[in-house]
Every structure is written in C-alpha cells, then in structure tokens.
Amino acid sequence: MKLDGYTRLAAVVANPIKHSISPFIHNRAFEATATNGAYVAWEIEASDLAETVANIRRYQMFGINLSMPYKEQVIPYLDKLSDEARLIGAVNTVVNENGNLIGYNTDGKGFFKCLPSFTISGKKMTLLGAGGAAKSILAQAILDGVSQISVFVRSVSMEKTRPYLDKLQEQTGFKVDLCALENVSELQARIAESDLLVNATSVGMDGQSSPVPENIVLPETLLVADIIYQPFETPFLKWARSQGNPAVNGLGMLLYQAAEAFQLWTGKEMPTEEIWQSLTEKYQ
C-alpha cells in the first residue's frame, strides 16, 4: 500500500476495537482495486464521538464504520439516514458525500448476500434472538419482501423485544410474530414451515452450547445460518449439517457488510472471492 498526500482515510470506530478484522478486509480491497485509501481502527471514548464524526468532514475521509457501543449514539451527528438505518435504529456505515454525512446499515444486506443462491423475497424465516444483528436482519428481510418472520427470544426478553417489533409494524405494516424460545412445540412448528433458520444470538461462541434443543427436526430444504464465525463451525451448524441441511456461518456476513460499505465509499466492487480466501485461511 502506497500512502501519499492524496490518500483518503476510512476507519472503524468502537470500544474495544483493536481486535477488529475490518482493517485487514478494507486495506486488501483498497490495494486490489488500486484505490488510494487506508483503513484504520479508532478506539475512542463516548466523549470523543462528536469530534470523531466532525473529522470525517474535516479530513475529507471516505467515511467510517461503527461498532458497539456507537451504532445508535452516532445518529444525532448525521445529516441523513438510509431506509434500513432508520428502520433498524442503528448505523454501521457513515458515507461522506461532499460534506453530507449519510448513515447506512449494511449488516442486513451483508447477511443476505452471503447466503448461497437464496433470496428472502416471498420466503418464511425463523430468527433466534433480537439484538443488534437480529434487528438488521429483520429490517432488511422486510425491505426485501419476506412473507413471514417468527422471532424467538427467551421469555424474560419478550417484554423488552415487543416495542421494537411494534415500531417495525408501524413503519412498514409488516407484523413479526414473537414467541418464547422455551416453547419447543411452537419452535418446531415454525421451523417446519420455514425456508431459513437464523441464530442471531451469541449462544455457541463457547463451542459447546446450541440455541435450540437437538430433538428439533429440520425440513430438508431449510437453509440454516449462524452469525457467529468464531468458532468457524458452531454446535448449531454441526447439528444442522448432521441432519443434511445446508449451513452457513457468520464470516460471510462480516465480509459482505464490508463490501457494501466499500462500494458506498468508493463506487467500486470489493473483490470478495479473493478476500474470502484469505479470511477462511485465517479463521478455519
């Protein structure tokens, strides 16, 4: 990578963030597309967020990515939000359009792009969890024409989850069904009629636990996805593959949400296949 007086910056902003794989992905992409850019990780305190956003304009940056805890906190400092960012209520990408700062959320698009030969339009989805990643998948599915969504959370989280689903219905007219994860017969019934089953919880990061009981029977055409990529194959995905179902981990979502951001910043397509190869070598 050659840096000079014309090099434009992009950064990921979060706390903590030094462990991030985003600089690896984006700097590879800058190099592969002969784009004069550099991507760094900025670990900042909340009190520095306003100044950090102001620096996007000040230094004529491409923009920034955001991770926890700043995806929602950044919104008041932006000029405009995309449809999906408004629906999700969180921003993971800020684009500098001639000094106008526009907030996007590329997580949902990245998720659906990483699913092999699958489109969500007209399909039924069962989603486990209702955190940040789940919200982005939910909102994008609705924007892309999903026909039915069943969200399962632990019964203690149902009250906390409902207001967001009500807000989604108010803004889109789409009603999401909310169910308790402990209700195994309901879980089985919903999965049986689904085209896509997604684990958007952190259950499985320990390499031992699974978000669903192993006696659940999966329909043979069901695609199973997990947003976790470390471990590369969670117990949930192993279980799905043992039933003969296609199963996808979260590494593709990480890559394709980055590719969406890269295109918004540069107008260029990220060479995802080439970078995917490097990522799988790193994590497999």
Swiss-Prot record:
Molecular-function GO terms, alphabetical: NADP binding; shikimate 3-dehydrogenase (NADP+) activity
Disulfide bonds: none
GO biological process, one term: amino acid biosynthetic process
SUPFAM superfamilies xrefs: Aminoacid dehydrogenase-like, N-terminal domain, NAD(P)-binding Rossmann-fold domains
InterPro entries recorded: Aminoacid_DH-like_N_sf (IPR046346), NAD(P)-bd_dom_sf (IPR036291), SDH_C (IPR041121), Shikimate_DH (IPR011342), Shikimate_DH-bd_N (IPR013708), Shikimate_DH_fam (IPR022893)
Gene3D superfamilies, per the entry: Leucine Dehydrogenase, chain A, domain 1 (3.40.50.10860), NAD(P)-binding Rossmann-like Domain (3.40.50.720)
Binding locations of NADP(+): 83, 129-133, 227, 250
Keywords: Amino-acid biosynthesis, Aromatic amino acid biosynthesis, NADP, Oxidoreductase
Active site residues per record: 71 (proton acceptor)
Annotated metabolic or biological route of this protein: Metabolic intermediate biosynthesis; chorismate biosynthesis; chorismate from D-erythrose 4-phosphate and phosphoenolpyruvate: step 4/7
Assigned EC number: 1.1.1.25
Reaction catalysis annotation: shikimate + NADP(+) = 3-dehydroshikimate + NADPH + H(+)
Binding site residues for shikimate: 20-22, 67, 92, 107, 229
Record note on quaternary structure: Homodimer.
Function: Involved in the biosynthesis of the chorismate, which leads to the biosynthesis of aromatic amino acids. Catalyzes the reversible NADPH linked reduction of 3-dehydroshikimate (DHSA) to yield shikimate (SA).
Name this protein carries in UniProt: Shikimate dehydrogenase (NADP(+))
Species: Streptococcus pneumoniae (strain JJA)
Lineage: Bacteria, Bacillati, Bacillota, Bacilli, Lactobacillales
Gene: aroE
